[in-house]
Amino acid sequence: VVLGGELVEDPLLCLGIESTAHTIGVGIAASDGRILANENETYKPSRGGIHPREAAQHHASVAHIVLRRALNSAGISPREIDAVAFSVGPGLGPCLRTGATLARALALKFEKDLVPVNHGVAHIEIGRHVTGFKDPVVLYVAGGNTLVTTHHEGRFRILGETLDIAAGNCLDVFGIKAGIGPMPAPEDYARRGVQLHHIPLRVKGMDVSFSGVLTASERLLNEGKRLEDVALSVTEAVYSMLTEVLERAVALTEKREILLVGGLAKSRRLQQMVSEMAALHSAEFKPIPDEYLGDNGAMIAWTGIQMLRYGLTVRVEESFVKPKLRVDESEVPWID
Protein backbone atom coordinates (compact mmCIF):
# COMPACT_ATOMS: atom_id res chain seq x y z
CA VAL A 1 0.00 0.00 0.00
CA VAL A 2 1.34 3.42 -0.94
CA LEU A 3 0.99 5.85 1.95
CA GLY A 4 2.32 9.40 1.82
CA GLY A 5 4.41 8.46 -1.21
CA GLU A 6 6.04 5.53 0.59
CA LEU A 7 5.36 1.78 0.36
CA VAL A 8 3.98 0.56 3.69
CA GLU A 9 3.48 -3.05 4.73
CA ASP A 10 0.12 -4.14 6.18
CA PRO A 11 -1.54 -3.92 8.57
CA LEU A 12 -2.39 -0.25 8.41
CA LEU A 13 -4.01 1.41 11.40
CA CYS A 14 -6.66 4.10 10.99
CA LEU A 15 -8.19 6.22 13.73
CA GLY A 16 -11.76 7.29 12.94
CA ILE A 17 -13.73 10.17 14.45
CA GLU A 18 -17.54 10.23 14.31
CA SER A 19 -19.40 13.45 15.19
CA THR A 20 -22.39 13.89 12.88
CA ALA A 21 -25.12 14.31 15.49
CA HIS A 22 -25.54 13.33 19.15
CA THR A 23 -22.54 10.98 19.36
CA ILE A 24 -18.81 11.70 19.48
CA GLY A 25 -16.95 8.49 18.77
CA VAL A 26 -13.36 7.40 18.24
CA GLY A 27 -12.58 4.04 16.70
CA ILE A 28 -9.38 2.34 15.59
CA ALA A 29 -9.34 -0.27 12.82
CA ALA A 30 -6.59 -2.37 11.26
CA SER A 31 -6.38 -3.32 7.60
CA ASP A 32 -6.33 -7.01 8.57
CA GLY A 33 -9.95 -6.65 9.66
CA ARG A 34 -9.59 -6.12 13.40
CA ILE A 35 -11.56 -3.42 15.21
CA LEU A 36 -9.12 -2.42 17.94
CA ALA A 37 -11.24 0.23 19.65
CA ASN A 38 -14.75 1.66 19.53
CA GLU A 39 -15.33 4.32 22.19
CA ASN A 40 -18.32 6.67 22.13
CA GLU A 41 -20.09 9.31 24.22
CA THR A 42 -23.61 10.54 23.48
CA TYR A 43 -25.13 13.96 24.14
CA LYS A 44 -28.49 13.55 25.85
CA PRO A 45 -30.57 16.74 26.08
CA SER A 46 -32.71 17.14 29.19
CA ARG A 47 -35.78 17.60 27.01
CA GLY A 48 -36.70 17.79 23.33
CA GLY A 49 -34.42 17.01 20.42
CA ILE A 50 -30.80 17.76 19.60
CA HIS A 51 -29.63 21.38 19.70
CA PRO A 52 -26.65 21.41 17.27
CA ARG A 53 -24.51 23.92 19.17
CA GLU A 54 -25.10 22.27 22.53
CA ALA A 55 -24.24 18.88 21.04
CA ALA A 56 -21.06 20.33 19.52
CA GLN A 57 -20.08 21.82 22.89
CA HIS A 58 -20.63 18.43 24.49
CA HIS A 59 -18.43 16.76 21.86
CA ALA A 60 -15.67 19.33 22.35
CA SER A 61 -15.73 18.83 26.13
CA VAL A 62 -15.39 15.03 26.05
CA ALA A 63 -13.44 14.42 22.82
CA HIS A 64 -10.07 14.16 24.59
CA ILE A 65 -11.51 11.60 27.01
CA VAL A 66 -12.98 9.45 24.24
CA LEU A 67 -9.74 9.70 22.26
CA ARG A 68 -7.66 8.59 25.22
CA ARG A 69 -10.00 5.68 25.94
CA ALA A 70 -9.75 4.50 22.34
CA LEU A 71 -5.95 4.64 22.31
CA ASN A 72 -5.77 2.82 25.64
CA SER A 73 -8.23 0.18 24.44
CA ALA A 74 -6.12 -0.44 21.33
CA GLY A 75 -2.90 -0.32 23.32
CA ILE A 76 -1.20 2.08 20.91
CA SER A 77 0.10 5.64 20.78
CA PRO A 78 -1.04 8.27 18.25
CA ARG A 79 2.28 7.96 16.41
CA GLU A 80 1.48 4.34 15.52
CA ILE A 81 -1.62 5.41 13.57
CA ASP A 82 -1.19 5.55 9.78
CA ALA A 83 -4.14 7.85 9.05
CA VAL A 84 -6.92 9.85 10.67
CA ALA A 85 -10.44 9.56 9.25
CA PHE A 86 -13.42 11.74 10.15
CA SER A 87 -17.10 11.95 9.27
CA VAL A 88 -17.28 14.68 6.63
CA GLY A 89 -21.09 14.50 6.33
CA PRO A 90 -24.02 14.35 6.26
CA GLY A 91 -24.85 15.72 9.67
CA LEU A 92 -25.25 18.78 11.86
CA GLY A 93 -22.75 21.47 10.90
CA PRO A 94 -21.46 22.40 14.38
CA CYS A 95 -21.06 18.73 15.33
CA LEU A 96 -19.28 17.85 12.09
CA ARG A 97 -16.89 20.78 12.51
CA THR A 98 -15.97 19.67 16.04
CA GLY A 99 -14.92 16.22 14.86
CA ALA A 100 -13.17 17.59 11.79
CA THR A 101 -11.17 20.03 13.92
CA LEU A 102 -9.92 17.20 16.13
CA ALA A 103 -9.04 15.10 13.07
CA ARG A 104 -7.12 17.95 11.43
CA ALA A 105 -5.20 18.64 14.64
CA LEU A 106 -4.15 15.00 14.98
CA ALA A 107 -3.22 14.71 11.30
CA LEU A 108 -1.07 17.83 11.46
CA LYS A 109 0.59 17.11 14.81
CA PHE A 110 1.53 13.53 13.96
CA GLU A 111 1.94 14.06 10.18
CA LYS A 112 -0.72 11.53 9.17
CA ASP A 113 -2.96 11.33 6.11
CA LEU A 114 -6.46 12.75 6.52
CA VAL A 115 -9.42 10.74 5.19
CA PRO A 116 -12.89 12.32 4.69
CA VAL A 117 -15.51 9.60 5.24
CA ASN A 118 -19.13 9.67 4.11
CA HIS A 119 -21.13 8.86 7.25
CA GLY A 120 -23.75 6.87 5.33
CA VAL A 121 -21.18 4.83 3.45
CA ALA A 122 -19.49 4.09 6.80
CA HIS A 123 -22.71 2.64 8.23
CA ILE A 124 -22.90 0.31 5.24
CA GLU A 125 -19.21 -0.63 5.28
CA ILE A 126 -19.10 -1.64 8.93
CA GLY A 127 -22.23 -3.68 8.27
CA ARG A 128 -20.65 -5.43 5.29
CA HIS A 129 -17.55 -6.08 7.36
CA VAL A 130 -19.21 -7.71 10.37
CA THR A 131 -21.69 -9.75 8.29
CA GLY A 132 -19.27 -10.76 5.55
CA PHE A 133 -21.76 -9.66 2.88
CA LYS A 134 -20.24 -8.76 -0.49
CA ASP A 135 -22.94 -6.92 -2.43
CA PRO A 136 -26.12 -6.43 -0.38
CA VAL A 137 -29.29 -4.44 -0.81
CA VAL A 138 -29.20 -1.97 2.08
CA LEU A 139 -31.91 -0.33 4.17
CA TYR A 140 -30.31 2.60 6.00
CA VAL A 141 -32.64 3.90 8.71
CA ALA A 142 -31.75 6.42 11.38
CA GLY A 143 -32.86 9.66 12.99
CA GLY A 144 -31.67 11.73 10.07
CA ASN A 145 -31.57 9.31 7.14
CA THR A 146 -33.92 6.82 5.50
CA LEU A 147 -33.03 5.23 2.17
CA VAL A 148 -32.69 2.00 0.23
CA THR A 149 -29.44 1.62 -1.68
CA THR A 150 -27.09 -0.84 -3.34
CA HIS A 151 -23.67 -0.66 -4.96
CA HIS A 152 -23.49 -0.21 -8.73
CA GLU A 153 -20.67 1.05 -10.96
CA GLY A 154 -18.36 2.49 -8.32
CA ARG A 155 -20.72 3.95 -5.75
CA PHE A 156 -23.89 3.32 -3.77
CA ARG A 157 -26.99 4.21 -5.79
CA ILE A 158 -30.14 5.36 -4.03
CA LEU A 159 -33.13 3.26 -5.10
CA GLY A 160 -35.62 4.91 -2.77
CA GLU A 161 -35.71 7.34 0.14
CA THR A 162 -37.96 9.37 2.40
CA LEU A 163 -39.75 12.26 0.74
CA ASP A 164 -39.98 14.23 3.99
CA ILE A 165 -38.74 13.20 7.44
CA ALA A 166 -36.58 10.22 8.38
CA ALA A 167 -38.14 7.14 9.95
CA GLY A 168 -36.15 7.55 13.14
CA ASN A 169 -37.12 11.20 13.40
CA CYS A 170 -40.78 10.25 12.96
CA LEU A 171 -40.67 7.83 15.88
CA ASP A 172 -38.58 10.18 18.04
CA VAL A 173 -40.99 13.09 17.51
CA PHE A 174 -43.98 10.85 18.20
CA GLY A 175 -42.43 9.70 21.47
CA ILE A 176 -41.54 13.22 22.57
CA LYS A 177 -45.00 14.59 21.75
CA ALA A 178 -46.62 11.64 23.53
CA GLY A 179 -44.54 12.42 26.63
CA ILE A 180 -42.63 9.12 26.69
CA GLY A 181 -39.39 10.27 25.07
CA PRO A 182 -37.59 9.30 21.84
CA MET A 183 -36.70 5.82 20.67
CA PRO A 184 -36.55 3.19 22.05
CA ALA A 185 -39.47 4.35 24.25
CA PRO A 186 -42.12 4.13 21.46
CA GLU A 187 -41.14 0.53 20.72
CA ASP A 188 -41.13 -0.34 24.42
CA TYR A 189 -44.69 0.96 24.72
CA ALA A 190 -45.67 -0.79 21.48
CA ARG A 191 -44.82 -4.17 23.02
CA ARG A 192 -47.70 -3.61 25.45
CA GLY A 193 -50.12 -2.60 22.72
CA VAL A 194 -53.04 -4.88 21.83
CA GLN A 195 -55.13 -2.96 19.29
CA LEU A 196 -54.02 -1.63 15.91
CA HIS A 197 -55.56 1.66 14.82
CA HIS A 198 -55.67 2.75 11.19
CA ILE A 199 -52.69 4.81 10.07
CA PRO A 200 -52.36 5.55 6.33
CA LEU A 201 -49.23 4.14 4.68
CA ARG A 202 -47.52 6.40 2.13
CA VAL A 203 -45.38 4.39 -0.29
CA LYS A 204 -44.64 5.74 -3.76
CA GLY A 205 -42.56 3.29 -5.76
CA MET A 206 -39.56 2.82 -3.50
CA ASP A 207 -39.98 6.19 -1.78
CA VAL A 208 -41.77 6.68 1.54
CA SER A 209 -43.38 9.53 3.46
CA PHE A 210 -43.72 9.62 7.24
CA SER A 211 -45.24 13.04 7.99
CA GLY A 212 -48.74 11.57 7.64
CA VAL A 213 -47.91 8.99 10.31
CA LEU A 214 -47.19 11.79 12.78
CA THR A 215 -50.43 13.58 11.90
CA ALA A 216 -52.43 10.38 12.36
CA SER A 217 -50.71 9.62 15.67
CA GLU A 218 -51.59 13.07 17.02
CA ARG A 219 -55.21 12.54 16.02
CA LEU A 220 -55.34 9.19 17.80
CA LEU A 221 -53.80 10.64 20.96
CA ASN A 222 -56.23 13.57 20.90
CA GLU A 223 -59.09 11.07 20.61
CA GLY A 224 -57.92 9.51 23.87
CA LYS A 225 -56.76 6.22 22.43
CA ARG A 226 -54.60 4.08 24.72
CA LEU A 227 -50.97 5.20 24.40
CA GLU A 228 -49.60 1.66 24.07
CA ASP A 229 -52.02 0.96 21.20
CA VAL A 230 -51.07 4.17 19.41
CA ALA A 231 -47.37 3.32 19.81
CA LEU A 232 -48.05 -0.14 18.36
CA SER A 233 -49.95 1.36 15.42
CA VAL A 234 -47.22 3.93 14.68
CA THR A 235 -44.27 1.53 14.85
CA GLU A 236 -46.06 -1.12 12.78
CA ALA A 237 -46.92 1.47 10.12
CA VAL A 238 -43.35 2.78 9.90
CA TYR A 239 -41.75 -0.67 9.84
CA SER A 240 -44.27 -1.98 7.30
CA MET A 241 -43.44 0.84 4.89
CA LEU A 242 -39.72 0.28 5.31
CA THR A 243 -40.01 -3.46 4.75
CA GLU A 244 -42.20 -2.95 1.69
CA VAL A 245 -39.75 -0.67 -0.12
CA LEU A 246 -36.84 -2.91 0.85
CA GLU A 247 -38.71 -5.90 -0.60
CA ARG A 248 -39.26 -4.00 -3.85
CA ALA A 249 -35.52 -3.27 -4.03
CA VAL A 250 -34.69 -6.95 -3.48
CA ALA A 251 -37.09 -7.93 -6.27
CA LEU A 252 -35.65 -5.28 -8.60
CA THR A 253 -31.96 -6.04 -8.07
CA GLU A 254 -32.34 -9.81 -7.59
CA LYS A 255 -29.56 -9.61 -5.00
CA ARG A 256 -29.70 -12.13 -2.19
CA GLU A 257 -27.98 -10.32 0.68
CA ILE A 258 -29.96 -7.87 2.82
CA LEU A 259 -28.30 -5.41 5.17
CA LEU A 260 -30.07 -3.29 7.79
CA VAL A 261 -27.97 -0.38 9.09
CA GLY A 262 -28.36 2.83 11.10
CA GLY A 263 -29.59 3.56 14.60
CA LEU A 264 -33.19 2.49 13.95
CA ALA A 265 -31.89 -0.88 12.74
CA LYS A 266 -31.54 -1.77 16.45
CA SER A 267 -35.31 -2.34 16.48
CA ARG A 268 -35.94 -6.03 17.11
CA ARG A 269 -39.39 -5.73 15.53
CA LEU A 270 -37.97 -4.22 12.34
CA GLN A 271 -35.30 -6.93 12.27
CA GLN A 272 -38.03 -9.56 12.59
CA MET A 273 -40.06 -8.12 9.71
CA VAL A 274 -37.00 -7.87 7.45
CA SER A 275 -35.95 -11.41 8.36
CA GLU A 276 -39.39 -12.77 7.43
CA MET A 277 -39.35 -10.88 4.14
CA ALA A 278 -35.84 -12.13 3.35
CA ALA A 279 -36.94 -15.73 3.86
CA LEU A 280 -39.74 -15.27 1.31
CA HIS A 281 -37.14 -14.27 -1.29
CA SER A 282 -34.55 -16.89 -0.32
CA ALA A 283 -32.27 -14.01 0.67
CA GLU A 284 -29.81 -13.89 3.55
CA PHE A 285 -30.26 -11.39 6.38
CA LYS A 286 -27.93 -11.05 9.36
CA PRO A 287 -28.59 -8.54 12.16
CA ILE A 288 -25.57 -6.39 13.04
CA PRO A 289 -24.42 -6.06 16.68
CA ASP A 290 -25.95 -2.96 18.29
CA GLU A 291 -22.54 -1.42 18.94
CA TYR A 292 -22.08 -0.98 15.18
CA LEU A 293 -25.62 0.18 14.37
CA GLY A 294 -25.75 3.53 16.13
CA ASP A 295 -23.24 6.22 15.19
CA ASN A 296 -19.76 5.04 16.18
CA GLY A 297 -16.10 5.73 15.57
CA ALA A 298 -15.26 2.19 14.45
CA MET A 299 -17.28 2.52 11.25
CA ILE A 300 -15.39 5.69 10.33
CA ALA A 301 -12.05 4.03 11.03
CA TRP A 302 -12.89 0.90 9.02
CA THR A 303 -14.14 2.90 6.03
CA GLY A 304 -11.04 5.06 6.34
CA ILE A 305 -8.93 1.93 5.84
CA GLN A 306 -10.76 1.14 2.58
CA MET A 307 -10.40 4.71 1.31
CA LEU A 308 -6.74 4.86 2.29
CA ARG A 309 -5.98 1.85 0.10
CA TYR A 310 -7.30 3.79 -2.89
CA GLY A 311 -5.61 7.07 -2.03
CA LEU A 312 -8.89 8.82 -1.20
CA THR A 313 -7.37 11.34 1.20
CA VAL A 314 -7.76 15.10 1.50
CA ARG A 315 -5.43 18.00 2.24
CA VAL A 316 -6.12 19.69 5.57
CA GLU A 317 -6.84 23.05 3.92
CA GLU A 318 -9.48 21.39 1.71
CA SER A 319 -11.14 19.25 4.39
CA PHE A 320 -14.44 21.11 4.54
CA VAL A 321 -17.41 19.34 6.14
CA LYS A 322 -20.48 18.65 4.00
CA PRO A 323 -23.69 18.66 6.09
CA LYS A 324 -25.89 17.81 3.09
CA LEU A 325 -23.69 15.04 1.65
CA ARG A 326 -25.59 12.10 0.14
CA VAL A 327 -24.58 8.44 0.07
CA ASP A 328 -24.38 8.45 -3.73
CA GLU A 329 -21.94 11.37 -3.89
CA SER A 330 -18.90 9.40 -2.70
CA GLU A 331 -16.70 7.02 -4.66
CA VAL A 332 -16.68 3.42 -3.40
CA PRO A 333 -14.16 1.69 -5.70
CA TRP A 334 -13.25 -1.18 -3.37
CA ILE A 335 -16.45 -3.17 -4.08
CA ASP A 336 -16.31 -5.29 -7.24
Residue ranges of each PLM-predicted region?
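A short helix-loop
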Residues: 5-12, 19-20, 36-38, 133-134, ...
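Glycine-rich phosphate-binding loop and adjoining helix at the ATP-binding site
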Residues: 80-125
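Conserved phosphate-binding/catalytic loops in two-lobed NTP-binding clefts
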Residues: 117, 275-300
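Glycine-rich phosphate-binding/hydrolytic loop that grips phosphoryl groups
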Residues: 288-330
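N-terminal beta-alpha supersecondary unit
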Residues: 11-90, 119
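Conserved phosphate-binding catalytic cores of ATP/NTP-utilizing and phosphoryl-transfer enzymes
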Residues: 8-11, 116-137, 303
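Short glycine-rich phosphate-binding loop at a beta-alpha junction
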Residues: 78-88, 254-264, 286-289
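A contiguous, well-structured pocket-lining segment that forms one wall/lid of small-molecule binding clefts
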Residues: 77, 187-258, 265-281, 308-311, ...
